[in-house]
């Protein structure tokens, strides 16, 4: 569905109704197989194996400040982070500008606490947010809290911009995404949330779309989900079907026998 941006003239949004009305949820530590070339749930790395690419300097600086809040008890690689910094160069973009990502330690993001660490496996920044009553988007790199939502902008010949808001599929990772042994938006086991994505990831969507547009999207999707026919289901969302068990027939002696 398409919306005109309520606060920016010349920007039109294309919204992915199918994914936003699905019941996807992050299953980190509860069935997530990771993003390596082989399934590795025992490593509990989620999508943290390659570090997080920063969107811009503002994103990077915010994470640097957040890292300063972490204690040694909260962050397994605190000493490495303080000694070498939490980010490193990772190449250049198409315009020749240096790109940065979170530093890697032992083949995964420096903020990823591993199995066996007393605070438990998972992102130290995410865990910090949960302990302090903040939303994880306040502390984590943008790409981390946005997943699996994705925004792309495309300039038009008439000077306008079309922004597409959709699912972050394998293609979002570049060529390497096709080598993943597993990806969560293709896994039926991840489509088990009680609420649709546009509700469960409301805070993330507000930050990506803006409050005014988010409210318009919610109003539209609320109406669409109640309409007949409902939106097309996501290809990975398998509807749960309940079947009634047939009662066993009784034999001539009163005992039950199965059909």
Q: Across the structure, where does each feature detected by a protein language model lie?
A:
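Short loop/turn segments that flank or connect secondary-structure elements
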Residues: 1-259
């Amino acid at each position: 569905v398409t919306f005109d941006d309520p606060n920016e003239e010349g920007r039109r949004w294309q919204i992915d109704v199918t994914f936003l009305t699905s019941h996807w949820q992050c299953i980190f530590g509860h069935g997530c197989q990771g993003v390596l070339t082989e399934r590795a749930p025992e490593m509990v790395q989620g999508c943290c194996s390659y570090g997080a690419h920063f969107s811009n300097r503002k994103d990077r600086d915010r994470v640097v400040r957040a890292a300063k809040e972490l204690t040694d008890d909260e962050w397994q690689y605190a000493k490495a982070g303080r000694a070498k910094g939490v980010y490193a160069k990772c190449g250049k973009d198409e315009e020749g500008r240096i790109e940065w990502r979170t530093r890697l330690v032992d083949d995964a993001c420096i903020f990823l606490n591993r199995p066996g660490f007393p605070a438990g496996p998972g992102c130290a920044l995410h865990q910090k947010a949960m302990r302090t009553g903040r939303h994880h988007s306040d502390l984590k790199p943008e790409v981390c809290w946005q997943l699996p939502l994705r925004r792309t902008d495309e300039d038009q010949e008439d000077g306008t911009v079309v922004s597409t808001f959709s699912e972050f599929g394998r293609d979002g990772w570049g060529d390497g995404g096709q080598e993943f042994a597993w990806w969560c938006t293709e896994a039926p086991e991840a489509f088990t949330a009680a609420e649709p994505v546009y509700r469960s990831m409301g805070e993330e969507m507000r930050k990506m779309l803006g409050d005014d547009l988010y409210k318009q999207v919610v109003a539209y999707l609320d109406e669409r989900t109640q309409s007949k026919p409902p939106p097309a289901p996501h290809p990975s969302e398998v509807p749960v079907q309940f079947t009634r068990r047939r009662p066993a027939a009784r034999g001539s002696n009163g005992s039950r026998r199965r059909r």
